[in-house]
Amino acid sequence: MTKEDCIEMQGVVIDTLPNTMFRVQLDNKHIVTAHISGKMRKNYIRILTGDKVTLELTPYDLSKGRIIFRSR
């Protein structure tokens, strides 16, 4: 899947799940399950409840996503 095919959205982490999975509420009030991208995992970026994040969603499954950026 190329980067052009992905949908980028903003959201807030509302819950931490096992295995570095997170429940994120998007700006449009939908709730999705997301995991950390490989570069964030490699650089030990910590994500906590309440952090604002940028997600990539695929058009095939809009209930799962990948966290690609954490805002302050």
Curated annotation (Swiss-Prot):
SUPFAM superfamilies: Nucleic acid-binding proteins (SSF50249). HAMAP family: IF_1. The keyword Glycoprotein does not apply. This is Translation initiation factor IF-1. It is found in: Cytoplasm. Component of the 30S ribosomal translation pre-initiation complex which assembles on the 30S ribosome in the order IF-2 and IF-3, IF-1 and N-formylmethionyl-tRNA(fMet); mRNA recruitment can occur at any time during PIC assembly. GO terms for cellular component: cytosol. Signal peptide: none annotated. The keyword Acyltransferase does not apply. PANTHER family: TRANSLATION INITIATION FACTOR IF-1, CHLOROPLASTIC. GO terms for molecular function: ribosome binding; rRNA binding; translation initiation factor activity. It comes from Buchnera aphidicola subsp. Baizongia pistaciae (strain Bp). Residues 1-72 form the S1-like domain.
